[in-house]
């Protein structure tokens, strides 16, 4: 039984929505941001990387993009653009199971530092549900949507059952999803090295072809990583020294109001997640029409008009997080979302692709 514990404080955020917010801020600052474009190969001049050849996946248009500095920030796939060099990433996958909030008493997260094999287990309230995780399994094939192994699912359910109000079963899992970690491998590490022993720090390399490669790290240090990349670029003469300046980030004008201060990511999703843009959301058609828990028609339209959403997956996985919270609900509402996307002018909404994806997030 439980003999004692330690209370501490940590941060929590919505990674996908935060990434979209960063992209929008970049556009506002003058950046050109391309969505749904795939890099096909690098462009060279006199043995130096000077850009990329890309393709717009929606229109099929070929794009030759040139830049003074090309940065390879492709996470676990970083080594695919440095085939002549020693691989620096030892990929690892972490599995997460989502269950209803009643499995965890209260709204505080629970961290169990000791499990049967030495890994930690966490139960974190998030957007009206509870995330259970995680695992640390080496992975070399690097699919875009990795699948959880049966033994990983069994481990999480078994260990969670020892500390939660009641033991969760496979039938209780609303969604299962997997993240890939770009862990940096020391030069002396072997293929047998345990991934949980590898560094979570970032790594930057300037290739002989004049291309910067960065991988590793985590969201907590993303600004420090960006500053480090710019510093390397300036030192290599790829960018001016002035590019390294990282201005402080000011909070939104309403971030300190009593109403905003009460917002928590433990709450079920809703208009409160839009912060100072709630008034914009309220003016869109379908503001009062709920399509699924925490998702309204207006939110779908907002995702297209202001958040660069083009497909059903964009909306249900990367703007709303419904796929990660309740895969069955996401699968059910997908046709309605597809129709709204088409109304908003999106031509290739990829409904069938999303339905297939949603099945892989279901255990039952």
Where are these regions (language model features)?
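Core beta-strand elements of the Rossmann-like FAD/NAD(P) dinucleotide-binding domain
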Residues: 58-69
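Short beta-strand segments that buttress and anchor functional surface loops
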Residues: 7-8, 53-56
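Flavin (primarily FAD) binding-site architecture
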Residues: 72-86
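Short, hydrophobic/aromatic-rich segments at coil-to-beta transitions
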Residues: 48-52, 107-108
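A conserved short coil-to-beta-strand element within the FAD-binding core of flavoproteins
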Residues: 35-50
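C-terminal accessory subdomains/tails of enzymes that are appended
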Residues: 7-17, 28-29, 44, 74-76, ...
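Glycine-rich phosphate/pyrophosphate-binding loop
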Residues: 1-4
């Amino acid at each position: 039984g439980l003999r004692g514990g330690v209370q501490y404080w940590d941060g929590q955020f919505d990674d996908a929505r935060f990434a979209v917010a960063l992209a929008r801020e970049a556009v506002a600052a003058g950046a050109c941001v391309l969505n749904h474009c795939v890099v096909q190969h690098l462009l060279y001049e006199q043995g130096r990387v000077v850009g990329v050849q890309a393709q717009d996946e929606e229109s099929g248009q070929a794009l030759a993009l040139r830049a003074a500095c090309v940065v390879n920030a492709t996470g676990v796939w970083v080594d695919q653009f440095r085939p002549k060099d020693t691989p620096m990433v030892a990929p690892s996958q972490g599995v997460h199971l989502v269950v209803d909030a009643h499995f965890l008493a209260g709204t505080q997260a629970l961290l169990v530092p000791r499990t049967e094999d030495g890994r930690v287990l966490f139960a974190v309230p998030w957007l009206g549900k509870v995330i259970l995780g995680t695992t640390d399994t080496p992975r070399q094939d690097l699919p875009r949507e990795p699948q959880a192994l049966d033994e990983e699912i069994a481990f999480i359910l078994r260990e969670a059952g020892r500390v939660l109000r009641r033991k969760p079963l496979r039938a209780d899992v609303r969604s299962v999803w997997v993240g890939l970690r770009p862990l940096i491998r020391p030069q002396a590490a072997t293929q047998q090295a345990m991934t949980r022993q590898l560094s979570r720090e970032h790594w930057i390399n300037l290739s002989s072809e004049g291309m910067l490669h960065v991988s590793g790290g985590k969201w907590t240090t993303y600004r420090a990583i960006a500053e480090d990349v710019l510093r390397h670029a300036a030192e290599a003469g790829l960018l001016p020294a002035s590019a390294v300046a990282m201005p402080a980030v000011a909070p939104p004008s309403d971030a300190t109001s009593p109403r905003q201060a009460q917002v928590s990511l433990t709450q079920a999703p809703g208009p409160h997640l839009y912060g100072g843009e709630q008034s914009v959301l309220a003016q869109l058609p379908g503001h009062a029409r709920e399509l699924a828990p925490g998702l309204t028609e207006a939110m779908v339209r907002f995702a297209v008009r202001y958040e660069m959403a083009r497909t059903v997956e964009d909306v249900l996985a990367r703007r709303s997080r419904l796929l990660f919270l309740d895969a069955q609900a996401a699968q059910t509402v997908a046709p309605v979302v597809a129709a709204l996307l088409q109304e908003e002018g999106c031509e290739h909404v990829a409904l069938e692709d999303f339905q297939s994806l949603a099945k892989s997030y279901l255990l039952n």
